[in-house]
Amino acid sequence: MFSGKVRAFIDEELFHSNRNNSSDGLSLDTPLAIHTPAKGFDADLSPQSLYDLHTVTTPVTPLAPDEWDFSLDQSSGVIPSPSSFLSDHNNNNLFSDDTISRQYSNTDDINPSDFGGQCAILDSQNFTLSNASTKSKWSFTKHGSNTPSDSSSPLCNSSKRVVGMLRRFLPSSRMVRLSKAHQPLRIPTTGVSLDSADLTPLSVSTSHLNHPSTSNSPDPLYSASQPPSIKTDASPVDIKNMDAAEKLKKIDLLLEEILQLDSAYDAAERRMIESGWSSVDEIRDVHNKRLDAWSEWKQKLLPLKKCC
């Protein structure tokens, strides 16, 4: 049943126990729980029997109940600060009554930062730990401490999760909330980085609107609603004198213009909604100007369609 090493160990234990015992049998002083033969051992022992064999060479003397009696009143209940412990660690009477009364008799002269938020100073003259929960002048924990208990607390973990969630919804660019006295907010649509210093949240500016005829306009939204008029604006007389090829070219220019305008307004409205810095009235104002641009574009396209 047992391997060779286990059987050799058991035989050695039996040999020593047999030599210590008397010739007539086991002595009363030997703390054996079972009787085992000295030679010819072939019994099927249980784990409890192996434990009893081990007690032959390693007897255990239990302690008396009064030896375990411990009272908090017999020991000092004051926890020294780190600095005071380093200064007095060579003193054999560190926790004596005289040292405690000399160091902590006047708690007003003690600097709270000296304790690092990790120990309590008791007002009780008995200096017992039983009053620590009601007599502490400073809390046991300090804000920002990196102890394992603080870092693993549910409150700390939940705070980290809340911060991470808020960062996902806060805008990453530097946007300033303008007052109601300003013009409606503007957002860039092309070629402007979100980290630009001169960025305003809402501004409709496209490359095809930088023509000199619209550069003097005070409102970029107004210029966006007014398409370039170099080739697209034509009088009815000019349209009648055009041939079919010129009319088709004019229609192509109008189509390209309205597509660029619609893309610019669509990007502006989408970014106004996603950023969260624009009110509903500001978004509605940009959308109305988008509809006005469509209406003006249709008025320009209508004469060309009649002539085709």
Swiss-Prot record:
Record keywords: Cytoplasm
Name assigned to this protein: Uncharacterized protein P4H10.14c
Superkingdom per UniProt: Eukaryota
Region (Disordered): 138-157, 205-235
Principal cellular location given in the protein's record: cytoplasm
Residue ranges, compositional bias (Polar residues): 138-148, 205-229
Disulfide bonds: none
Compartment list: Cytoplasm
Lineage start: Eukaryota, Fungi, Dikarya, Ascomycota, Taphrinomycotina
Entry's Gene Ontology cellular component terms: cell division site; cell tip; cytosol
